[in-house]
Design a protein with these regions (language model features):
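Compositional signal for N-terminal targeting/processing segments
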Residues: 52-451
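Bacterial Sec-dependent N-terminal signal peptides
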Residues: 1-4, 13-18, 23-24, 29-59
């Protein structure tokens, strides 16, 4: 490679020993020149993007809503299904849900309410909404809470009273209906609904007689999670049902509901994939409820409403998208994030299994602790309007659409985060909205009502 030498008189005059030193100027190679061009182009593109995109702080200030404002209106109305999920066990989470529900119901934007429960329990939540029977409601909350113990709470009990009040203020054609698509939580209300659907004379099937007596006495353990008395009663009934389907189909009050109950009982007798079951139940029950034409509000845990895979495993909402049930933009996902809050943690019992108290947690378990927190949560905290602030994350020109792991990446003290699991993803792949829930007290167990 030849180099061009340039003699510089001014420089050489300052050097000692009267020796002349040439200054060497190396010409860039073709490869180096190309690299410089690429770098310049990249910097230009980045500068253009920055010029047209807002900072996160500016964006959040322009896209935030106060849920506690009496004039609050949810900013999106065009959807097929909308979901709200947050960490379980904190009081203001239930309040946020009630505000969202009331706003959407009043605007006639949702027809069905899908809580994190099974078909049987949901059916009797509908009975409560009609009757106002608080004894029934308390028992429903106890069984509903078997799925999520942190929501077996006074706050959940009061939330349902609030839902009833909202529903009572609606015209008949605008009242919501509760539908359960989750795996069976306990056998009690599944069994009760089966008996209501299948009126069989005493003595025809011993398995049915035993099922009827079990529900009537109501003193057994209704757990589907081990070989309980109720599980064995239902096993025997399923055998008779399968052997005489024609008869049972001829007497049922609702074949679709009966078929779904039977299928879900059978699933409890073997290992099952919960998320797949939720998705399958949704599709099956859509025959009855026509979900595509009647929007639903879903209240489930954080993961179930994510719109993209996490650890390559598809959530309920992700399955709806991947199976072309709905387009991604037809699904709205709202994630709740806690700060300066506490959650219900454990229930305490004495040696006789009598309830004696509970514990709460305000560090681990809320997603905003110095040892464990969501990346980017400080941006929400610094721009909040009230204790319940809603942020629209996927509006036009949102920085959350561009290679961000905010609100999905979990930072851990002295441990590796889940950043690699989110490679190639961005915040709005998962959620459309975020609610910052501040200064929330922990839920109180439903058992506290009996004190």
């Amino acid at each position: 490679m030849f180099r061009r030498l340039v003699y510089n008189k001014n420089v050489s005059a300052l050097l000692p020993h009267h020796r002349q030193y040439p200054t060497v100027v190396r010409q860039l190679t073709k490869t180096e020149r190309n690299k410089m061009k690429i770098k310049t182009l990249v910097l230009f593109i980045v500068s253009i993007q920055l010029a047209f995109s807002q900072s996160k702080t500016e964006y959040l200030k322009n896209n935030r809503f106060d849920l506690l404002n009496s004039n609050f209106e949810f900013p999106q109305s065009n959807f097929k299904i909308i979901g709200f999920g947050a960490y379980h066990g904190s009081q203001e989470t239930e309040k946020a849900e009630n505000i969202l529900l009331e706003n959407l119901i009043n605007k006639n934007k949702v027809k069905y309410y899908l809580p994190e429960t099974d078909l049987g329990i949901a059916y009797y939540f509908n009975q409560y909404l009609k009757s106002g029977d608080t004894i029934l409601l308390k028992d429903l909350v106890r069984h509903y809470g078997v799925r999520v113990p942190q929501e077996k709470s006074i706050e959940t009990y009061n939330k349902w009273k609030g839902i009833k009040k909202i529903n009572d203020n609606q015209p008949e054609n605008n009242k919501i209906q509760v539908v359960g698509i989750d795996i069976i939580v306990t056998y009690k209300y599944t069994s009760k609904l089966l008996i209501e659907l299948l009126k069989i004379e005493k003595g025809k099937y011993k398995s049915y007689d035993n099922l009827y007596e079990m529900v009537k006495i109501d003193t057994t353990d209704f757990s589907p999670y081990y070989d309980s008395y109720s599980k064995n009663i239902l096993k025997n009934f399923i055998v008779d049902y399968e052997n005489d389907k024609t008869y049972f189909n001829s007497i049922t009050n609702n074949k679709i509901i009966t078929d779904n109950l039977i299928e879900n009982i059978k699933l409890t007798l073997k290992k099952q994939d919960r998320e797949k079951t939720i998705f399958d139940n949704y599709l099956f029950l859509s025959q009855l409820y026509d979900f595509k034409s009647n929007p639903q509000f879903v209240r489930m845990g954080f993961f179930h409403i994510e719109k993209d895979r996490e650890n390559n495993y598809p959530s309920f909402f992700t399955r709806l998208i991947e199976n072309n049930i709905y387009k991604k933009e037809e699904i709205v996902s709202i994630a709740g994030f806690l700060t300066k809050s506490r959650v219900l943690w454990d229930l305490k019992y004495d040696a006789n299994k009598k309830y004696i108290g509970y514990t709460t947690e305000g560090g681990y378990g809320i997603g905003d602790y110095w040892k464990e927190y969501f990346k980017g949560i400080n941006k929400l905290k610094n721009n909040r309007l009230s204790n319940l602030t809603l942020y629209h994350l996927n509006n036009e020109n949102s920085p959350y659409k561009k290679n961000q792991t905010d609100l999905m990446e979990i930072k851990l003290f002295l441990k590796k985060s889940n950043k690699n699991d989110l490679k190639g993803k961005t915040t709005t792949d998962y959620f459309d909205f975020a609610i910052l829930i501040s200064n929330s007290q922990a839920n109180k167990p439903i058992e506290e009502l009996d004190k």
